[in-house]
């Protein structure tokens, strides 16, 4: 038991360190090759922050731990909005840009609804005799299609947008080429090995305590893979730049569904078992709550009181999951 917990923690460390080194090496190399900081931020850095969720969901799907794969994504999205959004707003009220309200938040809500529609064949398929909910390879390709549209749209908007004051314009670090390659290769190895340890130990811990893999995925695994987003958002709030937090949260949620579940289910279909329709509805309700606070009540500002409501919502959802054990 103690060994499983240590391996679980080691897996988290390897995943986060691997993502950091991979992002550092790849982004520095890309900037040396002439890519702008904005393009690097929209692609490599965004991928780096979503790498923990990607590797964990992918490894879970390959190993047959479908509930961890799906629970990780649904749980991460809920954690991002309620826990990270709530904590960040408590540190400093969050100002939301007009573009985020008009474009990114609606896209996030669309991704939630698309995933719910594709996942619940017994409700939406309309096929007699359908008794199992599966995110199939074809549906995975559909999610990847949405991701390509999202990426193309984002680049098109970015070209016409003014220069992002938060983009990384720091001087390119003078790392030797061999060290950059070591960062990239070492980061990938750490991600894969850490992901394997993380998933295997999480599954073992669930069996030891008699907990379902969906519970582990929705809670511990989701929180663990969301640590980069939590660190980034809280750090931004402490630096008096809390507006970065919502873009970080919303972008991560879109990546989680369109890219991560798209790749995972394309490689191996994911059966929807322990993750219930209620979990999907909590995710959708969280997104609607964020939108309501931003548009209807907050005049593009999520205040501390609203942050407290988000955080309490996460606590209530976690208590509900514990009561279902």
Predicted regions and their residues:
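Hydrophobic alpha-helical segments, chiefly the membrane-spanning helices
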Residues: 1-325
């Amino acid at each position: 038991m103690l060994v499983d917990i240590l391996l679980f923690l080691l897996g988290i460390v390897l995943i986060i360190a691997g993502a950091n080194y991979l992002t550092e090496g790849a982004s520095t190399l890309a900037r040396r090759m002439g890519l702008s900081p904005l393009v690097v931020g929209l692609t490599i850095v965004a991928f780096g922050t979503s790498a923990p969720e990607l590797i964990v969901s992918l490894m879970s799907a390959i190993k047959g731990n479908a509930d961890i794969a799906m629970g990780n994504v649904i749980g991460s999205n809920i954690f991002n909005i309620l826990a990270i959004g709530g904590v960040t707003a408590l540190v400093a009220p969050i100002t939301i840009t007009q573009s985020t309200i008009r474009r990114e938040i609606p896209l996030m809500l669309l991704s939630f609804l698309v995933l719910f529609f594709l996942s619940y064949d017994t409700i939406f398929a309309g096929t007699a005799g359908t008794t199992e909910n599966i995110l199939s390879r074809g549906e995975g390709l559909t999610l990847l299609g949405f991701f390509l549209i999202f990426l193309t749209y984002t680049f098109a908007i970015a070209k016409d947008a003014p220069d992002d004051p938060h983009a990384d314009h720091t001087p390119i670090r003078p790392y030797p080429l061999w060290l950059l390659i070591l960062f990239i290769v070492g980061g990938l190895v750490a991600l894969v090995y850490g992901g394997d340890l993380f998933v295997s130990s999480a599954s073992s811990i669930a069996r030891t305590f008699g907990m379902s893999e969906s519970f582990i995925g929705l809670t511990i695994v989701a929180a663990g893979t969301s640590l980069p987003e939590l660190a980034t958002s809280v750090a931004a709030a402490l630096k008096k730049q809390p507006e970065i937090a919502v873009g970080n949260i919303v972008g991560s949620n879109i990546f989680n569904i369109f890219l991560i579940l798209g790749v995972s289910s394309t490689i191996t279909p994911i059966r929807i078992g322990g993750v219930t329709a209620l979990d999907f509805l909590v995710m959708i309700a969280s997104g609607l709550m964020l939108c309501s606070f931003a548009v209807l009540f907050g005049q593009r500002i999520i205040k501390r009181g609203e942050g407290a409501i988000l955080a309490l919502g996460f606590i209530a959802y976690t208590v509900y999951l514990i009561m279902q054990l």
